[in-house]
A protein has these predicted regions:
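Chitinase-like catalytic core of GlcNAc-active glycosidases
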Residues: 68-82, 93, 107-232
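Conserved small/polar residues in nucleotide/adenosyl-binding loops
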Residues: 1-4
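Boundary/entry segment of secreted carbohydrate-active catalytic domains
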Residues: 18-21, 60-88
Length: 232
């Protein structure tokens, strides 16, 4: 590792192992998991070096538990593009509740703009992480479009077509929920945007899915800027 100066005031987490195990001939993650009655995922979380090196070495020491662990349940979401490096994604997945994959756009006639998401979905399930579909106003050229978003918000028939296609794809690919990420929404579309979210939520909830929506951070209702004004 390259030596890097730590910034003053940075907090460091120091965990002290309370239970260690030395790998013996024939051991696997599954057998060690059974021996200590802990999930394999916990072994990966306690030993990040195992995530990209799944083969155990005889004599290798692994951490079973740490001293004075403060455990509580939290929900963690991570975003990833389909072209993310596999080794980076694998290091993150053991710590994620949801993996939101960026992202589907839609055409003016309601067809979804496809992405290569299936490898990430399979990997998410491998680590018991729930994959979340993302819908945005990204067009065929890869840019966010306020005009494309407005077209959707103001056209109920288009909303129905887009949602029909989304639900069919979610069932097919194994998504558990939908994340809506619309940037550069114009102020004139603020009310219609909320109406779209209400309609989307009702369609999703009726079929057992959830809805997340991404909002720009606002410090006041009067905050100016195209990223903020339409977000209530």
């Amino acid at each position: 590792y390259k030596r890097q100066a730590l910034p003053s005031g940075q907090a460091l987490l120091i965990l002290i192992p309370s239970v260690l195990y030395t790998v013996r001939p024939g051991d696997t993650l599954s057998s060690i998991s059974s021996k200590f009655a802990i999930p394999q995922l916990t072994l990966l979380q306690n030993n990040p070096s195992l995530i990209n090196s799944p083969y155990l070495q005889v004599g290798q020491t692994i951490v079973i538990a740490f001293e004075e662990e403060k455990q509580r349940r939290i929900t963690v979401n991570g975003y990833a593009y389909p072209y993310i490096r596999e080794d980076i994604l694998r290091r993150a997945l053991p710590y994620l509740t949801y993996l939101t994959i960026f992202g589907y756009g839609f055409t003016p006639d309601g067809a979804l703009i496809p992405i290569n998401d299936e490898p990430l979905i399979r990997m998410a399930y491998e680590y018991r992480t729930a994959p979340v579909m993302l819908l945005s106003s990204v067009t065929e050229d890869g840019n966010f479009s306020g005009e494309r978003a407005s077209l959707l918000f103001q056209n109920q028939a288009l909303q129905e077509t887009v949602m029909d296609n989304i639900l069919a794809l979610m069932h097919k690919k194994g998504y558990v929920g939908l994340d809506v990420d619309f940037e550069y929404v114009e102020q004139k579309d603020a009310t219609a945007f909320l109406g779209f979210l209400e309609y989307t939520a009702s369609r999703l909830h009726a079929e057992g899915f959830f809805l997340h929506t991404d909002l720009a951070p606002k410090t006041s209702a009067a905050q100016a800027g195209l990223l903020y004004e339409a977000h209530n």
